């Protein structure tokens, strides 16, 4: 009888141990895999959602429309001016075997190259990506995919020559 009590106690302990193991945190949802950074995967309209971990200040915005066919972009932004601006240019993607995917670009109308090249990471099929400045890893931008640039922003950024 004494051995049966010990056996029963061990059996109860074993059942509790199995119960706790079944409730472990290994059931977390798997992380969404990143897509390859190609012009085709970047194609479309992107809104700057966060800059350095913070949402954009009220009244500021940045939308970038990337065209995969000819690797051009149109940017609609309002950061450093009281008016929105429409900026165009071209971009290039390079896959560095040591650093990863890097996007760089140049502006049309002789305005020069982008101030920075950016590491592109966490490009997700669900519609977001991270750009980190190559020469300043504290400069981090999170973009989210959107259907289109809002009409009021297109109107605000319309070139004066188009009116």
Label each residue range with its predicted role.
Residues 41-47, 70-74, 97-104, 125-130:
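Short, hydrophobic/aromatic-rich segments at coil-to-beta transitions
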Residues 44-71, 104-114:
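Short, solvent-exposed loop/hinge segments that bridge or flank secondary-structure elements
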Residues 56-102:
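N-terminal glycine/threonine-rich, aromatic-flanked beta-hairpin/loop signature
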Residues 51, 76-80, 96, 106, ...:
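Surface loops and adjacent helix of pleckstrin homology
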Residues 16-41, 146-163:
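Bacterial Sec-dependent N-terminal signal peptides
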Residues 1-22:
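Sec-dependent bacterial lipoprotein signal peptides
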Residues 100-163:
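Beta-sheet ligand-binding and adhesion/scaffold domains
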């Amino acid at each position: 009888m004494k051995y049966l009590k010990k056996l029963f106690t061990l059996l109860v302990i074993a059942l509790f141990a199995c119960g706790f193991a079944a409730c472990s945190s290994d059931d977390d949802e798997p992380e969404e895999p990143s897509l390859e950074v190609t012009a085709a995967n970047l194609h479309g309209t992107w809104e700057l959602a966060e800059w350095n971990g913070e949402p954009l200040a009220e009244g500021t915005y940045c939308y970038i429309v990337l065209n995969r066919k000819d690797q051009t972009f149109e940017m609609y932004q309002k950061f450093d001016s009281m008016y929105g601006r429409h900026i165009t240019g071209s971009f290039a993607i390079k896959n560095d075997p040591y650093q990863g995917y890097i996007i760089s670009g140049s502006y049309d109308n002789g305005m020069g190259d982008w101030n920075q090249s950016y590491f592109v990471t966490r490009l997700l099929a669900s519609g977001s990506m991270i750009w980190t400045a190559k020469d300043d890893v504290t400069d981090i931008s999170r973009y989210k995919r959107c259907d289109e640039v809002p009409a009021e922003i297109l109107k605000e950024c319309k070139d004066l020559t188009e009116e």
